């Protein structure tokens, strides 16, 4: 128990710097654009031929989905997001790689940034809008970027770790032994008893 508490504390001490930095960057960017875009004509600042900064409140989930249920759902979104952040933190504590740790830190930082918006503003502020001719990508914010970066890191970590495990297994066992072990694992339940 003491070892687990120590691991949780060390994970918090290490991850909090990353998470807090990402949350500060996200909240400062939102604050700046809220303060400066509300006075622009059409609530928009044209940056390039394919990028605008726009003043948009997202009352739904990612990319504005379910926004029509806002009056019933904001409390549900806050509760769900809080549970997800706690679960992601648990996964980060269990993570065995630096990439996994970094990936979870980015996802948690982005999720907390959007959670702060929901708690204190009632909706998530989105401002980055990419478009090309008739195609328009849904408006998003830096917290969404952090979540996406974190997910990409976690996917890469999963596949690179899987590859390393497979290579180490091949060094120590031949293919027949690996297949036999996999078959034994498939035929054993979670209590270690044979299913057959």
Curated annotation (Swiss-Prot):
**Protein name according to UniProt:** Lipoprotein signal peptidase
What family does this chain come from, according to its entry? Answer: Belongs to the peptidase A8 family.
Question: Which HAMAP family does the entry link to?
Answer: LspA
Keyword field = Aspartyl protease, Cell inner membrane, Cell membrane, Hydrolase, Membrane, Protease, Transmembrane, Transmembrane helix
Location of the protein in the cell:
Cell inner membrane
Pathway connected to this protein:
Protein modification; lipoprotein biosynthesis (signal peptide cleavage)
Molecular functions (GO terms): aspartic-type endopeptidase activity
Tell me which EC number(s) this protein carries: 3.4.23.36
Kindly report the protein's main subcellular placement as a broad class: membrane
**PROSITE patterns from the UniProt entry:** SPASE_II
**Residues annotated as transmembrane:** 43-63, 75-95, 100-120, 135-155
Instruction: Give the GO cellular component terms, alphabetically.
Output: plasma membrane
InterPro entries cross-referenced by the UniProt entry = Peptidase_A8 (IPR001872)
Q: How does it sit in the membrane?
A: Multi-pass membrane protein
The active site of this protein is located at 126, 144
**In which organism is this protein found?**
Rickettsia canadensis (strain McKiel)
This molecule's function is given as: This protein specifically catalyzes the removal of signal peptides from prolipoproteins.
Catalytic activity from the UniProt record: Release of signal peptides from bacterial membrane prolipoproteins. Hydrolyzes -Xaa-Yaa-Zaa-|-(S,diacylglyceryl)Cys-, in which Xaa is hydrophobic (preferably Leu), and Yaa (Ala or Ser) and Zaa (Gly or Ala) have small, neutral side chains
**A Pfam family:** Peptidase_A8
Q: Write out the GO biological process terms.
A: proteolysis
């Amino acid at each position: 128990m003491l070892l687990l508490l120590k691991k949780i504390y060390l994970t918090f001490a290490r991850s909090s710097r990353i998470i807090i930095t990402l949350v500060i960057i996200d909240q400062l960017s939102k604050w700046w654009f809220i303060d400066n875009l509300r006075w622009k004509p059409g609530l928009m600042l044209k940056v390039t031929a394919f990028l605008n900064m726009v003043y948009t409140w997202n009352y739904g989930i990612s990319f504005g989905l379910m926004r029509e249920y806002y009056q019933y759902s904001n409390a549900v979104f806050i509760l769900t997001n809080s549970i997800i952040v706690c679960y992601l933190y648990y996964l980060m504590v269990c993570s065995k790689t630096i990439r996994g740790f970094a990936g979870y830190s980015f996802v948690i930082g982005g999720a907390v940034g959007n959670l702060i918006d929901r708690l204190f503003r009632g909706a998530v502020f989105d401002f980055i809008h990419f478009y090309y001719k008739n195609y328009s990508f849904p408006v998003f914010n830096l917290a969404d970027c952090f979540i996406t970066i974190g997910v990409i890191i976690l996917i890469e970590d999963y596949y690179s770790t899987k590859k390393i495990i497979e290579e180490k297994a091949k060094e120590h066992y031949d293919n027949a032994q690996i297949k036999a072990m996999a078959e034994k694992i498939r035929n054993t339940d979670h209590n270690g008893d044979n299913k057959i």
